[in-house]
Amino acid sequence: MKILVCVATCLAVGYYGSLATQSSVNTWFPTLEKPVFNPPNWLFAPVWTMLYILMGIAAGLVWDRYESDKYEVKNALVIFAAQLLLNLLWSILFFGLRNPMLAMLEIVVLLLIIYETHYKFKNISKMAGYLLVPYILWVGFATILNIAIWYLNREI
């Protein structure tokens, strides 16, 4: 049940982030210069859906260990919640406010907090740590992509 609650929470955050994205993905975003390694738009929804599911499973596995180490689990889940909120904030900054520079600064912080979450999770549940690796890799790629988009459009 804990895993289900965590997966549903992560998917809900993804849904709310998509609301900010929808307003600009077909209007403002196509007008931006993008690097050659920019993935096609259709790829983002399935990748993020899978990542939110993996994040939720990881958080549920950690939450399941609450009785064995309340302090560490609580600390890890607070950091997880912080990165989840930063994940949502990125969509608002980049697509909602149409501000790649602010989103770029925020995503660097997000990536660091995701890494901290991974570190905390793997010390509680190795599997939970492994489940966050695709998320770290994707947000690392998204960070490079965000920097490139900002750089290519900095005069706008």
Feature annotation, model-predicted:
Residues 1-20:
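N-terminal signal-anchor transmembrane alpha helix
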Residues 23-36, 68, 153-156:
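Membrane-interface helix termini and inter-helical loops of multi-pass transporters
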Residues 53, 57-91:
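Helix-adjacent hinge/juxtasegments
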Residues 39-54, 98-110:
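Membrane-interface loop-to-helix entry segments
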Residues 144-156:
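Juxtamembrane boundary at the C-terminal end of a transmembrane helix
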Residues 77-84, 103-117, 135-139:
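Hydrophobic alpha-helical segments of small multi-pass membrane proteins
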Residues 90-101, 124, 152-155:
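Membrane-interface helix caps and helix-loop-helix hairpins in membrane proteins
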Residues 94-97, 116-130:
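Membrane-helix boundary connector in multi-pass membrane proteins
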